[in-house]
Design a protein with these regions (language model features):
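Active-site flanking loop/helix segments enriched in acidic
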Residues: 2-24, 61-72
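Alpha-helix N-cap/helix-initiation sites
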Residues: 18-25, 42-48
Length: 118
């Protein structure tokens, strides 16, 4: 499976961070598949949904969020585009779009400027 291979590449050790990532990503993937199964009229690509859901947070290890064992140097909000860069470099540009676009929903321009978000 593409997603597990990439996760294992960037998270080679079995540790709390990998456990958190996998648990969360599986929950997101399960919800995405539930939506696909309950809305056949959308004709969604289940394989893509699963893989993209599993990979959407792959960039978290590059961020600073010590509460979830992330000891990188970038703000957590950056994990989307950081993960997209990783996934894109592996040749999966469609999956990268999901990584980079899943963060920031509901933020106004004023919030972004006020909080000095990237």
């Amino acid at each position: 499976m593409l997603s597990i291979k990439l996760i294992d590449k960037y998270y080679p050790e079995e540790n709390e961070l990998k456990h958190i990532l996998l648990t969360h990503s599986r929950s997101v993937a399960d919800k995405a598949l539930w939506i696909a199964d309950n809305h056949p009229e959308l004709s969604l690509d289940r394989d893509f949904l699963y893989e993209a859901a599993m990979l959407h947070d792959i960039g978290i290890f590059l961020t600073k969020a010590e509460g979830i064992y992330c000891f990188g140097d970038k703000p957590y909000i950056c994990h989307g585009y950081l993960g997209a860069d990783l996934v894109r470099s592996e040749g999966y540009s469609r999956h990268a779009l999901v990584c980079e676009r899943h963060t920031g929903a509901g933020l106004s321009l004023e919030d972004i400027v006020k909080q000095d978000l990237p």
